[in-house]
């Protein structure tokens, strides 16, 4: 599919860089450049107990679905809104095709494209990708922040943006003038000179690039999101590096208390106005350097051998009790992030001492050993409340008793009882896949391992239950459960 797009996109640069050779299209009140494909969309499974993400219909496999028309109010030729949410690559190709169409219609037209979305959604990446292909001028809204007004390291308040300067810059560029614009480098204000390239394309990227004051200046508008959950992780990981804060929990606190409330209030409403809407499926967990490798098996299946092995260690196991709350993310429309996909869920672990730890992870099955890239750190009750205020909901609670029998050389062997499953498990964890596999072979569990997560097994058990109340999990069922089991949470 991507090759078909690329062969078509390869012509764009020549269209944009040699505009004198481009012929105008026929003047008509409404122009259809590509016949839209028939839509046969199915509503994906809204059931929270679903074990896998919904499968998207394969759209746009043959052609780009782009429509153009004359605006009856302005008299300008413009791109109609694409009525579907696109993948990152699809959105990139559609944006480039939209530029090509406008250029074909009026070779002298200066085209301004705006890209908006939450922090970490991929705005800069998309802008650079489009800019490199069409030789466009890229402007970041972040450079127009009034540094003297920044307080508490909050760069995300729209009142900090010098919109007057942004608007005057765009207008002057449209008049083919050379302009001096600000440039923030290491939190210090510098400046740079820019002018239009021969392609006559301006790309403005930033959280507020589709705000009401800027939209009238845009010829093409693009909204990009990755679901609050993925954006949250990406923001944490980037913030740890760039913010100068001491820990990831400080960054998370800032995001839950400042960044995403700002997004919900000031950015999200403008994204609905975009002509092209993109849902980025980039997985930030792939950036984690040291994943945890896990192998587990049911204890009762080989109880006698396990007991002999554990006894041979000649240790008194360390016993710990945990309560794991699983939060599923808020939803971005019908084509947004799947709440049913357990890979999108966040685990909040409460220890017997009242401490909370948050874990973002994906578990990938690979033979007898699962690979679990993860991000884990301690949080406060206030931060947990911040996540709930962003729209996260409690989907399940699993209580476990853990006996740590071995913890040496980076390998941990535990015997765990999951109350809700009413089963014991032997589990091996470590940062070396080879060492985890060696330990699993010694315990003779490589052929009897359980690859599924405890969360998956929990929902599988609920499905089999004859109790109609559990045939389909509803948020209220679990919310009432946590209130009952954690009455002392407010006292922490």
From Swiss-Prot:
ATP-binding is among the record's keywords: yes
Function statement: Catalyzes the conversion of uridine into uridine monophosphate and cytidine into cytidine monophosphate in the pyrimidine salvage pathway.
Organism: Dictyostelium discoideum (Social amoeba)
Any one Gene Ontology molecular-function term assigned to this protein's record: cytidine kinase activity
Residues that coordinate or bind ATP: 117-124
Low complexity: bias regions: 468-483
GO biological process, one term: UMP salvage
Stretch list, region Disordered: 36-56, 468-492
Pathway involvement of the protein, from the record: Pyrimidine metabolism; CTP biosynthesis via salvage pathway; CTP from cytidine: step 1/3; Pyrimidine metabolism; UMP biosynthesis via salvage pathway; UMP from uridine: step 1/1
A cellular-component GO term for this protein: cytoplasm
InterPro entries: CYTH_domain (IPR023577), P-loop_NTPase (IPR027417), PRK/URK (IPR006083)
Catalytic reactions on record: uridine + ATP = UMP + ADP + H(+); cytidine + ATP = CMP + ADP + H(+)
Protein family membership: Belongs to the uridine kinase family.
Domain CYTH: 290-460
Pfam families per the UniProt record, alphabetical: CYTH, PRK
Enzyme Commission code(s) on record: 2.7.1.48
Record keyword Nucleotide-binding present: yes
Keywords: ATP-binding, Kinase, Nucleotide-binding, Transferase
Protein name: Uridine-cytidine kinase D
Listed CDD domains: UMPK_like
């Amino acid at each position: 599919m991507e090759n078909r797009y690329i062969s078509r996109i390869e012509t764009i640069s020549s269209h944009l860089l040699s505009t004198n050779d481009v012929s105008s299209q026929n003047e008509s009140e409404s122009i259809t450049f590509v016949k839209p494909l028939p839509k046969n969309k199915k509503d994906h499974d809204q059931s929270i107990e679903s074990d896998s993400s919904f499968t998207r219909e394969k759209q746009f496999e043959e052609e780009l679905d782009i429509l153009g028309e004359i605006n009856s109010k302005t008299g300008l030729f413009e791109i109609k809104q694409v009525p579907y949410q696109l993948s990152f690559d699809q959105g990139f190709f559609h944006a480039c095709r939209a530029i090509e169409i406008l250029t074909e219609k009026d070779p002298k037209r200066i085209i301004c494209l705006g890209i908006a979305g939450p922090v970490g959604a991929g705005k800069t990446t998309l802008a650079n990708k489009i800019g490199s292909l069409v030789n466009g001028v890229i402007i970041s809204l972040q450079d127009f922040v009034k540094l003297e007004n920044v307080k508490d390291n909050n760069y995300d308040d729209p009142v900090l943006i010098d919109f007057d300067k942004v608007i005057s810059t765009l207008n002057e560029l449209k008049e083919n003038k050379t302009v001096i614009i600000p440039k923030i480098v290491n939190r210090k204000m510098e400046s740079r000179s820019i002018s239009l390239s021969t392609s006559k394309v301006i790309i403005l990227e930033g959280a507020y690039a589709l705000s009401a004051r800027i939209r009238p200046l845009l010829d093409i508008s693009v909204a990009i999101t990755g679901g609050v959950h993925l954006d949250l992780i990406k923001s944490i990981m980037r913030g740890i590096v760039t913010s100068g804060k001491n820990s990831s929990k400080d960054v998370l606190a800032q995001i839950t208390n400042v960044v995403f409330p700002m997004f919900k209030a000031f950015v999200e409403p403008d994204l609905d106005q975009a002509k092209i809407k993109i849902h980025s499926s980039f997985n930030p967990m792939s950036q984690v350097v040291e994943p945890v490798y896990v192998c587990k098996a049911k204890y009762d299946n080989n109880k006698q051998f396990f007991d002999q092995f554990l006894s041979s260690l000649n240790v008194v196991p360390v016993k710990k009790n945990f309560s794991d709350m699983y939060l599923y993310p808020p939803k971005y429309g019908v084509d947004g992030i799947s709440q049913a996909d357990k890979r999108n869920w966040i685990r909040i672990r409460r220890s017997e001492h009242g401490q909370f730890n948050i874990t973002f992870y994906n578990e990938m099955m690979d033979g007898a050993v699962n690979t679990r890239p993860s991000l884990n750190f301690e949080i406060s009750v206030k931060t947990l409340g911040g996540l709930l205020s962003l729209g996260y909901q409690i989907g399940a609670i699993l209580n476990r008793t853990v006996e740590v029998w071995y913890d040496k050389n980076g390998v941990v062997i535990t015997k765990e009882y999951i109350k809700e499953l009413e089963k014991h498990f032997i589990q091996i964890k470590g940062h070396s896949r080879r060492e985890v596999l060696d330990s699993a072979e010694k315990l003779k569990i490589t052929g009897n391992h359980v690859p599924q997560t405890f969360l998956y097994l929990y929902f599988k058990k609920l499905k089999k239950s004859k109790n109609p109340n559990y045939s389909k999990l509803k948020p209220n069922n679990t919310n009432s459960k946590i209130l009952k089991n954690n009455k002392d949470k407010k006292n922490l």
